């Protein structure tokens, strides 16, 4: 849920740009960002990461870009799983989940084509939320740390339980993973003053 919320707020501009202009525009976007940030370094009165701060400010004026049913599931469940199926696999997955959730906690819904595109795009831009959050709030935060954890195929416990002496050093944690690959991306922003190397 934390990752969903962070991506919704801090990756909104990237989501909208890709949705409206396509991924082919990304190199142009990154070049524009680079030029703005280089320009801001030449003038002391302009903040570092000006492009991120400007894009974040402008994104506040764009309406909610996510489907209502996705937000409802965000409110209902802490963890979300996006499964993309095709052909006969669609009905097979639907039948499986209908049976599975008769006896297990959770729920599912079959996305419309539009919802499916938005769900996948939201997951795609989630990685950028971590860097944007840090860029916007940097003066109140410590360093960033990212880990990619590969799990054995039979591992069922994906979520770490850090000892309090480590957990207390972390300001924010964002997790997202690839279940069929058994990889979890764990992103941390440390509290201000914490030595990441230590």
Each PLM stretch: what is its role?
Residues 1-198:
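Noncatalytic alpha-helical scaffold of FAD-dependent oxidoreductases
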């Amino acid at each position: 849920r934390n990752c969903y919320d962070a991506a919704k707020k801090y990756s909104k501009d990237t989501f909208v740009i890709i949705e409206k202009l396509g991924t082919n525009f990304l190199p142009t976007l990154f070049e524009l960002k680079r030029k703005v940030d280089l320009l801001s370094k030449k003038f002391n009165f302009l903040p570092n990461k000006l492009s991120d701060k400007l894009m974040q400010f402008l994104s506040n004026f764009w309406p909610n870009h996510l489907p209502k049913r996705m937000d409802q599931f965000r409110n209902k469940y802490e963890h979300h799983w996006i499964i993309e199926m095709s052909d006969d696999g669609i009905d097979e997955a639907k039948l499986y989940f209908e049976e599975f959730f008769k006896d297990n906690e959770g729920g599912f819904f079959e996305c419309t084509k539009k919802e499916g595109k938005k769900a996948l795009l939201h997951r795609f831009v989630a990685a950028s939320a971590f860097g944007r959050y840090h860029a916007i709030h940097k003066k109140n935060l410590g360093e960033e740390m990212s880990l990619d954890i590969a799990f054995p195929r039979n591992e069922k416990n994906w979520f770490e339980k850090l000892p309090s002496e480590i957990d207390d050093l972390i300001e924010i944690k964002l997790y997202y993973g690839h279940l069929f690959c058994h990889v979890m991306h764990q992103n941390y922003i440390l509290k201000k003053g914490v030595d990441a190397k230590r």
